[in-house]
Amino acid sequence: MAADLAVLVAQGDATSEAIARAYQLARAIPEANMIRLPVPGGSDVIGEAAFAVLKAAIDARLPATAQATLVTWTQPSRVQGACSMGITSALAFGFSASQCGGCSRTAASAYFDSDSSRPFDDLGIRPSMMLGAPTLAAAQALIARGVAADGSQPAGTGHLLRTADAARSVRYPDWLTLPTAWATAPGLALRYTDASAASAASATTPTATANADTAISNQTDVLFYFTGLATVPLLASNRFLPGAAADHLTSFGGLLPGANGQMPATDWLAAGATASYGTVEEPCNHTEKFPKASVLIEHYLRGATLIEAYWKSVAWPGQGLFVGEPLARPWSQPPQAVIDGNALVVSSRSLRRNSIYRVDFRPYGGTAWAPLATMTAGQPRPVTWRVPLPADPAGGHLRWMGPCATQPALLCVLAQSN
C-alpha cells in the first residue's frame, strides 16, 4: 500500500527528484513518506562507512508506519566493505559481512516465504527495491506498467527455461512440477522448457539468431520468465504484460550498469518487465541467493505486491539487487468476511497453499473457543467459504485462524470479532 512505502530521493539529483515526484503522483505516496536527503553520487559504489551514515539518516526520517522503501536513484547501487551487498538488501538489513562474501553461505532472511504483510513490524526488516530506470521517460513507462497491473488479473504465460548452461540452470528442479501444479489456475499457463541438451556454445554465446534452445521469442503474453544465462537474447521480440516478473541466474546481473560483461537485470525492465533481480558480486550458483519461482508465483497470485513476492522468494538476498516498480499488484483482492443470515461467508484469494484455516466460536460470557469449520487451502484463487453459525440465542464471538505471519507452519489468529 502507498501508505506503507517510503520513497528515497537523492536531493540535488534532478533525475532522482523528477522520478520521485512522478512516482508520488502516480501512487499517491504521502508527503511524509518522501525522504529527501543528500546521497553520494557519481559512482555505482558506496563504501561501508559512508553507507552507515546514509542509512542512519534515512532511518531517522522514516515514518514508523513505513514497511518498505523505494530507491529512485541509480548510483550508488551497491555497498562495498569486505564484500559487496546490493543497496536494496543493505537498506533492509544494514551492511554486514555475514550478508555477502563471494561463494560462501550468506545470512538467511526471516522474510523468505513468510506470510508477513508488515515486515518491519513483524521482523524489523524493510524490503527495498530500486526503480532502476536511468531516465524520467523510462521511469514513467515503468511506473505506468505497475499501475496498469493493479487488479488486472492478467491472462498470460510464465516461461521456465532450462538452458544448456548447466551452472546457471540449477534452479530447474523447482520448475519441474509447476506447470502441472498450476494447470487449473485461471488465466495462467506455466511452460517448462528443457533445452539442456542444446549446444553449449549457443547457451554461452547467444546471438540475435538464437532460438528456443537459448531463449523464448515473439511471445505476446509474458507474465513470468525465469532462465539461466549470462545474457538473454531476443528480449525485445517479446511482449511483457504489466506486472511481469523476469530474471536470469548469472553472477553479475545486479552489478550496474555493465554487469561485468553480462546482462544487467535492468535490461529486463527496458524490455518491458515490471521487476527483476540480480547479484552484485560473484555469489556462485547457490539457489538460495536467487528467486525461487514456486514461492514468487504463489505469493504474487495470492495478492502480494511485486516487492513482497520478489523479496519473499529469495532465501539469502544479501548480495542481491531488487529492481522495478514495487507496488504492482495484479491479483489484489482483500479478504472479506460478512454475516449472511445464519452463516459466516469468507471470501479471499490470499489463502496459503496446503495450509489449514479454521473458524472458531465462543459464546458471550464464555472462555472456551470451539471450532466451527476447518478447511485446507488449494491453489491461490478466489475462494468463498460459507460457515454455518450455531443457533445460540445469546450470540458470541468469531475468530479466523490461519498460518502465522512469521511461522506459517503454526496457527495464529488472523481476525476476531468484537
Spell out what each predicted region is:
Residues 1-345, 351-356, 366:
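Cysteine-dependent hydrolase recognition
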Residues 332-418:
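Low-complexity, Ser/Thr/Pro-rich intrinsically disordered linker/stalk segments at domain junctions
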